[in-house]
Regions:
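Structural motif
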Residues: 1, 30, 63, 92-95, ...
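Active-site metal-coordination/substrate-binding segment of hydrolases
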Residues: 2-63
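Short beta-strand segments
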Residues: 4-6, 65-67, 94-97, 117-119, ...
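Acidic-glycine-rich active-site phosphate/pyrophosphate-binding loop
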Residues: 12-26, 91, 106-117, 282
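Phosphate-handling active-site elements
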Residues: 27-29, 49-63, 87-90, 145-155, ...
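Short, conserved micro-motifs enriched in small and acidic residues
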Residues: 31-43, 51, 71, 132-135, ...
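Acidic/histidine-rich catalytic neighborhood of metal-dependent amide-processing enzymes
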Residues: 39-113
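Metal-dependent amide/peptide-bond hydrolase catalytic core
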Residues: 115-321
């Protein structure tokens, strides 16, 4: 049984905290601090039980898989996957302790994050028709991305188990230009695709790149052939979808005494364990994702107790009788 989590956290810059985000503070039955909800509470619970794991004779070994740089696109776990891929024996199942309120999660969307650099042709703004405005052409591509997002919202495919039941596209960061009287020769923006498990995000990315090449660059090259678009993948990970009827899911539900399961809006490393290694994976951990990444992030003592009880039940179920 593999217990998995990530050790990194998101930054606190620009957030107004009431306490030191990197000193754990207890107040009103809650523990405040960066990463308390996402997902260091789970890691702390697991590590606190390592002595018992080591001293107890188990029917199956317990593997601890803690990664880094998950928050920037599941980057650090790649080295772990490379290592596990060549092992003769792999874990039979994986529990990722992201905050789910200690409920079983069997699915989440995948993600493809892309950076687009638009190369224009600068000139004085009084001669703007002689230049190639990188911001203008970036804007046209952003509008096209928004159009694709609208088409997905109308035509699907759909998965009713999600709060947003279709693949989404979203532009989140834009930058460009140096002065109002200069036609900008550079604009950069980042967009992401959050896709359903069964959808291939590369198909959408191909549509976006083809629109840029076939429609926008042709117009740009009438003035300067060195202008154009550059696409860079920032991060990508697959979606997760685990059959709720398999023995592993039933086993975990039994330990929790809760037969419910769901799909969530946030991602995890679970799809990578499932897709690359073929390890049945689910997400289940203490805390609430609504508290993650915010100022005054916290986890309740009640959730930690539930998480600890679950790990104790897991250990007890694996004890060699």
């Amino acid at each position: 049984v593999m217990l998995s989590g990530h050790t990194d956290v998101v930054p606190v810059s620009g957030q107004d905290w009431d306490t030191d985000p990197f000193s754990l503070t207890e107040s009103s039955d809650k523990l405040y601090g960066r990463g308390s909800a996402d997902m260091k509470g789970f890691i702390a619970l697991v590590l606190s039980r390592v002595p018992e794991m080591v001293s107890t004779e188990l029917t199956k070994p317990i593997h601890l898989a803690f990664s880094y740089d998950e928050e920037i696109g599941c980057v650090g776990v790649q080295r772990m996957l490379d290592l596990l891929e060549h092992q003769p024996i792999k874990p039979s199942c994986c529990i990722i302790g992201e905050p789910t309120g200690m409920e079983v999660v069997i699915g989440h969307k995948g993600k493809l994050a892309t950076r687009v650099k638009v190369r224009g042709h600068a000139c004085h703004s009084g001669q703007s028709p002689l230049g190639v405005n990188a911001i203008d052409f970036a804007s046209e591509l952003i509008v096209y991305i928004r159009k694709l997002a609208h088409e997905k919202s109308q035509n699907g495919p759909f998965d009713k188990d999600y709060e947003v039941p279709y693949t989404t596209l979203h532009t989140g960061v834009v930058g460009g230009g140096t002065a109002l009287n200069i036609v900008p020769n550079l604009c950069q923006f980042d967009f992401e695709i959050r896709h359903l498990y069964e959808e291939d995000p590369q198909h959408l990315l191909d549509q976006i790149e083809n629109f840029a090449r076939d429609h926008l660059e042709n117009e740009m090259h009438l003035i300067d052939s060195d202008t154009g678009f550059d696409f860079e993948t920032l991060a990508t990970y697959p979606g997760l979808l685990t059959d709720p009827g398999i023995e592993f899911v039933t086993y975990v539900k039994g330990l929790l005494d809760n037969n419910a399961h769901s799909k969530v809006i946030f991602g995890s490393e679970g799809g990578l364990f499932q897709k690359r290694l073929g390890i049945p994976t689910l997400v289940c951990g203490p805390g609430n994702i609504d508290q993650a990444h915010k100022a005054n992030e916290y986890i309740s003592l009640e959730q930690l107790e539930k998480g600890g009880n679950f790990l104790d039940c897991l250990l007890e179920s694996l004890v060699l009788s």
